[in-house]
Amino acid sequence: MKKIMITGALGQIGTELVVKCRTLYGNDNVLATDIREPEEGSALKNGPFEILDVTDKARMDELVESFKPDTMMHMAALLSATAEKNPLFAWDLNMGGLMNALEVAREYKLQFFTPSSIGAFGPSTPKVNTPQVTIQRPTSMYGVNKVAGELLCQYYFEKFGVDTRSVRFPGLISHIKEPGGGTTDYAVDIYFKAVREGQYSSFIAKDTFMDMMFMEDAINAIIQLMEADGVKLINRNAYNLSAMSIEPEMVKEAIQEYYPDFKLDYDVDPVRQSIADSWPNSIDVSCARAEWGFDPQYDLSAMTKVMLDAIEGKEKAEVK
C-alpha cells in the first residue's frame, strides 16, 4: 500500500488528486499539504493535512520524517499567466520548491512525481502533432521553469537513481475548482459562465487551438503512470498527454447542444494570447500510450455534458 505526500494539495489538480489517492490507498495514507488551511467542508478534511511552504526545506524534511511516505507528488507551482506577472517569485517558488522536493526524494528514497506542461514548448516547436522529443524553447517564465524541471527530474533519475516520473499536461478542465491563473482557463470558465450567465467573453482568440483534457482523465493518468513498471518507462521525465485539440468556437458549439442560446464573444488578453500562440496546436501522445497504456475516456462532447450537469447541480444546491 502506497503512502503518499502531496504538495500544492489545494490547487486545481491537487484537490482532486488527494481525493482519488485517498479513495485508492486509504485516507490516513495520503498527507495533503499546502501553504494555507483548506476551507471548512473541504474534501481534504477527511485525512491528514499539514501547512507547508515548499520553499522551506526544513519543514518539508520534518513532515517526511514524521509521516514516512514512500511517494512524493509535488504539485505546488505558480501557473503560466500568474508567473508572467511576477517572474522572480515564479522562479523562486517553482524551481526552489522543486529542488527541495527532489532533494527530499533523494534523501529519503521516495518515488517522485511532478507535472510538466505543454507550456514547456515554444514558438519554434513543431505545432502540429508535436513529437515527444523535440525543440523546447519556451518564451514564458512558466515554460522555462517546466523545461528546467523536466531536465532536473531526468538528472535526479540518472545521477541519483530517484524514481522520477512526469507528464506534460495540456489544459485541464474541471468543475471542482474554478480557474486559477492559467492560459487554458478559458475552457473551464466558459462552462461556469454558460450556466450562470448564458454568455462568455473569451480572453483567448477564435481559432486558437490548444490541447485539453478532462481532469478525471488527468488524475487517472497520474495514478496509472505511478503504478507502471519503471523498466518500461523510456520518456519518464515528461510524457506528452492530451485528449483533444480544441478552440473556443468548438467549445461554444458543444455547449449550445444543451444551451442553444449561449453566446460567445472575445476580449483577448494579450499576455495569455501570446503564451497560447507559442504553444502547439496538437501533440503526439503515442509514447504514453505505448509505454504505460495512457487511454483518456472523455472527448469534448462527453466532457461538456459532465461539466454542465455538475455546475448546474452546484448552482441548484447553492440556491437552496
Swiss-Prot record:
<comment type="similarity">
    <text>Belongs to the NAD(P)-dependent epimerase/dehydratase family.</text>
</comment>
<dbReference type="Pfam" id="PF01370">
    <property type="entry name" value="Epimerase"/>
</dbReference>
<dbReference type="InterPro" id="IPR036291">
    <property type="entry name" value="NAD(P)-bd_dom_sf"/>
</dbReference>
<dbReference type="GO" id="GO:0006567">
    <property type="term" value="P:threonine catabolic process"/>
</dbReference>
<dbReference type="GO" id="GO:0008743">
    <property type="term" value="F:L-threonine 3-dehydrogenase activity"/>
</dbReference>
<dbReference type="InterPro" id="IPR001509">
    <property type="entry name" value="Epimerase_deHydtase"/>
</dbReference>
<protein>
    <recommendedName>
        <fullName>Uncharacterized epimerase/dehydratase SSP2164</fullName>
    </recommendedName>
</protein>
<dbReference type="InterPro" id="IPR051225">
    <property type="entry name" value="NAD(P)_epim/dehydratase"/>
</dbReference>
